[in-house]
Curated annotation (Swiss-Prot):
The chain crosses the membrane at residues 5-25, 37-57, 66-86, 91-111, 161-181, 386-406, 409-429, 452-472, 477-497, 506-526, 539-559. One of its GO terms (molecular function) is monoatomic cation transmembrane transporter activity. It comes from Photobacterium profundum (strain SS9). This is Putative transport protein PBPRA2420. The keyword Transmembrane helix applies. One of its GO terms (cellular component) is plasma membrane. HAMAP family: YbjL (MF_01015). Residues 203-292, 293-377 form the RCK C-terminal domain.
Amino acid sequence: MNIDVASLLHQNDILLLFVVLAVGLSFGKIRFAKMQVGNSIGVLLTAILFGNAGFTFNTEALNIGFMLFIFCVGIEAGPNFFGIFFRDGKHYLLLALVVLLSAIAITLAMTHYLGLDIGLATGLMAGSLTATPVLVGAKDALNSGLSGISDPDIIKQTIDSLSVGYAMSYLMGLISLIFLAKLMPKLQKQDLAESSQQIARERGIGEVGQRKVYLPIIRAYRVGPELINWIDSRNLRELGIYRQTGCYIERIRRNGILANPDGDAILQEGDEIALVGYPDSHARLDPSFRNGKEVFDRDLLDLRIVEEEIVVKNDNISGKRLSELNLSEYGCFLNRVVRAQIEMPMDHNILLNKGDILQVSGEKSRVLGLAERIGFISIHSQIADLLAFCCFFIIGLLIGSITLAFGHVAFGLGSAAGLLIAGITLGFLRANHPTFGYVPQGALNMAKDLGLMVFMVGIGLSAGSNLFDSFAHIGPMVLVTSLMVSVIPVVLAYLFGAYVLKMNRALLFGAIIGARTCAPAMDMINEHARSTIPALGYAGTYAIANVLLTIAGTLIIIMN
């Protein structure tokens, strides 16, 4: 039996879609030196090759891809967006604006100088900035009629040009950004590793790699004469056992009665005490605790140690420094801090935002008490609130369909901006109401990644049919322009952040990468800095940059 694979793919669009996805994702796993091709590039290049071979797809049917992607981006940005925008994000907002406005200026200037059509120029800008939201906003402006173009053939030609420009410039944008991240600190005689260590020393930050990856343990000891001499009539607060060792006393048994001590309690000879702490903390205890006096008793040791993810929600906590939580008073241990899916360094001076996730371990009742003070414990359910997801998706589409008329000029946000606003709102409400709009992070990641990959298939198939012909005519101009759009905004943002805002170089580079929304480059920066300190800057600009880039893509098309 002979199977004509090409004919089968031409006849079955769904089969073609998933074949391109499977081949592209496999290609994305290939590594060159230390750099992985990545899913986006793998799928895009594969789709271009299939498009060049004559395979086509109704790209309108793939619009659900960019809609899912931009809606999920909004949900992720929602918990931190308003905190960054209104409180501590002045530097990050300015850096994002420097990158975006300079990129727009260069794009428009080169469009005029080289005579490029606006579709090609906008796609070139999106690819050069490795910013898919720009492409999403631009394509939506064309499809929704916001561009003012009514001729379907011109709209299709412009969308094809978008795809060609993006496909030509994406790889150049990614490689040049990574190259800049390595080269610029050396040219400025700045070592990212040293800059990271400087922040760590100034703020007392513990690196993520040094955090505990196991739960605290419980051990019990009997108070003997040696320990009484060491205590010297001091109460537990004055002894400061937690400050010295990292252990705290959870229970005391005195005369057969179990009690939870407070800071005023004074230990007496014969008391049996249960201490909670990491193994290395127990090892730091004074020998008077341990030498032959350990107690093995079920009632004394019957404590439930848990690890929970606490979401910051309460207004009286948002805006405070991590050190102000005084976790030691609650007998809890902080394992990590996560913001916008980025694991942050253990910086006790970091300002907490609503939606931040604190992974905390300790005795169950203490962790629950801390969660009540800070916010709420993240739901462990794997079931998504699909009703809220669908309702806010509908709201986003409705917002995008609203147009305002000023005489003969009509203006609207478009589906991309509408879905982004709805997603941000859902994410913000989720951070404030634990049972509303819950979407497991794994499900959110899958929806976002699948949406992006489906969108990339549409872009690649659309561009592939005439990409190589276009490259033969305008390829060198596009590559030069792409390099300018990629490099110049980064250099300007670096100079602005370093000499005007006086930012630490590690934080500055993280913020610039966040303004470019380029996760692969962020991994390279962390590796180059031998630290996760740059993630502090990345999280600061990432959320707001996604919003600005989407709006920018729409505005560029409308203005032309």
